[in-house]
Amino acid sequence: MKEKVVLAYSGGLDTSVILKWLCEKGFEVIAYVANVGQKDDFEAIKEKALKTGASKVYIEDLRREFVTDYIFTALLGNALYEGRYLLGTAIARPLIAKRQVEIAEKEGAQYVAHGATGKGNDQVRFELTYAALNPNLKVISPWKDPEFLSRFKGRTDLINYAREKGIPVKVSKKRPYSEDENLMHISHEAGKLEDPMYIPDEDVFTWTVSPKEAPDEETLLEIHFEKGVPVKVVNLKDGTEKTDPLELFEYLNEIGAKNGVGRLDMVENRFIGIKSRGVYETPGATILWIAHRDLEGITMDKEVMHLRDMLAPKFSELIYNGFWFSPEMEFLLAAFKKSQENVTGKVIVSVYKGNVMPVARYSPCSLYNPELSSMDVEGGFDATDSKGFINIHALRLKVYRLTKKGYEK
């Protein structure tokens, strides 16, 4: 009996060649295709996998789970890698790998496989998830396999092999970028973008219009949260209302994209140490991130917020590096869930030509006291108390300065 392997399959050149290569090595290959919002013809992918040699093909719609259990979860901790990247690719990988493991267990497969390269982050994200969820599964990673690497040294070898084996190869002109698309974002890398001084042409962007070409009128959105989780969005101009999590997120993508929101061009640090330039389009998540952060301003205790903000970079790093299913992540998520207990209310944001600006907010759990904050009303605050407050904090500074002068003499 052949040993079984569950392959994370996209229908592209790399994973199609890997599928056939695994079949030739004597494996029974089960192809797994995850729909996380990419614009693909899934029936065509299924047909291609079967013709290439897969014994079975799983195609699953994971979009709703992706939104509720991954995108919204990352929002609780204000995940933002290196202060800029909203982690669209990184957040999707643990979900895909988790289902791959579950299918392997269901099918009695001994192996899981993926087509991620040996230079990127995805190989780590997939394999750490496999290890965390089922340490007994064996991993086949062809782009780190000496036998595979000796046979396929580049794209030309892959194309020649595919044609030799009757695997359909698209002859249409391919976009000169490496792209990853899901419900949260689309990323563009490689090609001309590898030159950090190259200014991307407008044709790089496929989701968002240029802010310069966006409508001349703002869109006002009222976004509601319960304990940090988005529950409703209302367009205050036309009355459109969305409460279903998936529909809500898709609608924010639509509004953000047509208003030029969510573009990012940055050089980031990959986990393995290589610097990489990425151009991202993340419209809906950008709107949510800004609105959520604004609501926290009136609902979170100062010290809780500052402590959470200290943990947020580590949280983002764990997601980026593939540690979604780790004990440290469990700890952080428990802390973030606690921090969001009062983050309930609504924020009105103005979406206009690439910008998202909060303009109003309300919460039944608000810690904002107009009388305390007023420049004109005391509101129970005795201003003379500030003198002692300042003196206490100044003591350390005075001692430091006087001591330093003594040393210098």
From Swiss-Prot:
Compartments it resides in: Cytoplasm
Entry's Gene Ontology BP terms: argininosuccinate metabolic process; L-arginine biosynthetic process; urea cycle
EC number of the protein: 6.3.4.5
Positions of L-aspartate binding: T117, N121, D122
Pfam families registered for this protein in UniProt: Arginosuc_syn_C, Arginosuc_synth
Encoding gene per record: argG
Name this polypeptide is given: Argininosuccinate synthase
Species name: Thermotoga neapolitana (strain ATCC 49049 / DSM 4359 / NBRC 107923 / NS-E)
Main location: cytoplasm
